[in-house]
Amino acid sequence: MATVVLGGDTMGPERIFPNQTEELGPHQGPTEGTGDWSSEEPEEEQEETGAGPAGYSYQPLNQDPEQEEVELAPVGDGEDVVADIQDRIQALGLHLPDPPVESEDEDEQGATALNNHSSIPMDPEHVELVKRTMAGISLPAPGVPAWARELSDAQWEDVVQKALQARQAAPAWK
């Protein structure tokens, strides 16, 4: 790589940003009074426990060695598994929604019309078509949670039936 010589001076990074050991000529030296980059006083470092620029501060995590550890219960059979799964479903907010509140003022015809209004009328042929179509649908393996893979269809139906019965037996508080 060739160096271009202009007026006896070489141009390169060492000339643009000279180091402290080189002498600066009169046209290259800093003017008086501009020794610092800014006229402001150097900023003081913030204390470790002090608030940051947005008002946030460091909050240390609990380091106690006597922390409670969660023990996983061994997987049981039947009702234990169903109860455990029901608890998980409720904790995740995946439980069935509350049934609509029934008014005592409604007459039977109005209630029947309301129930029929929310359902789609289908003949038995159409019902079978929907069942076959839904049976052909499969979710990808990562889309199915581990607890759902552990349940058989019969166990899942039992969970749903128990949840429905519990809702029907529970008094309407709302």
Swiss-Prot record:
Protein name per its UniProtKB record: Male-enhanced antigen 1
Top-level lineage group: Eukaryota
Question: Which is a GO BP term held by this UniProt record?
Answer: spermatogenesis
Which tissue types show expression of this protein?
Highly expressed in testis. Transcripts can be found in primary and secondary spermatocytes, and spermatids, but the protein itself is only detected in spermatids. No expression in Leydig cells, spermatogonia, or sperm. Very weak expression in the heart, kidney, spleen, thymus and ovary.
For region Disordered, the annotated ranges are 1-78, 94-122
Q: Which residues carry this modification: Phosphoserine?
A: S103
**UniProt keyword Amino-acid biosynthesis, yes or no:** no
Mark out the compositionally biased spans (Acidic residues).
Answer: 38-48, 65-78
Q: What is the lineage of its organism?
A: Eukaryota, Metazoa, Chordata, Craniata, Vertebrata
Q: Which gene encodes it?
A: MEA1
InterPro entries associated with the record: MEA1
Give the matching Pfam families: MEA1 (PF06910)
Q: Give the keywords, sorted.
A: Developmental protein, Differentiation, Phosphoprotein, Spermatogenesis
The protein's role, per its UniProt record: May play an important role in spermatogenesis and/or testis development.
